[in-house]
Amino acid sequence: MANIKSSKKHISISEKRRKYNCSKRSMIKTFMKKVLFFIKEKNRIKAIKFFYIFQSLVDRYSLKKIIHINKASRYKSVLMNNIKKI
């Protein structure tokens, strides 16, 4: 454990940031599951609607470095290809 006051503050800040990032990653996964659910149900309109929301979230959080840019691109391309198959 850190003894210096600034180090203790940095640890608490890092913990807050980690919790924030985990919640945002969880939100991305939840929207991805919703899109996959509508793809499985063959509901193209709702799948596209949730895909656009998912796409904006992924783009926003990839720019903030919460997820990697290549991972964001991979998520979007996989989902869009699945939507096209409906």
Curated annotation (Swiss-Prot):
GO terms, molecular function: small ribosomal subunit rRNA binding; structural constituent of ribosome
Entry's Gene Ontology cellular component terms: cytosol; small ribosomal subunit
InterPro entries found in the cross-reference section: Ribosomal_bS20, Ribosomal_bS20_sf
Pfam families: Ribosomal_S20p
GO biological process: translation
SUPFAM superfamilies to which the protein is assigned, alphabetical: Ribosomal protein S20
Keyword S-adenosyl-L-methionine: no
Assigned keywords, A-Z: Ribonucleoprotein, Ribosomal protein, RNA-binding, rRNA-binding
UniProt entry tagged with the keyword Ribosomal protein: yes
Function: Binds directly to 16S ribosomal RNA.
PANTHER family per the UniProt record, alphabetical: 30S RIBOSOMAL PROTEIN S20, SMALL RIBOSOMAL SUBUNIT PROTEIN BS20C
The family this protein is said to belong to: Belongs to the bacterial ribosomal protein bS20 family.
NCBIfam families: S20
Name of the protein in its database record: Small ribosomal subunit protein bS20
Organism per entry: Buchnera aphidicola subsp. Cinara cedri (strain Cc)
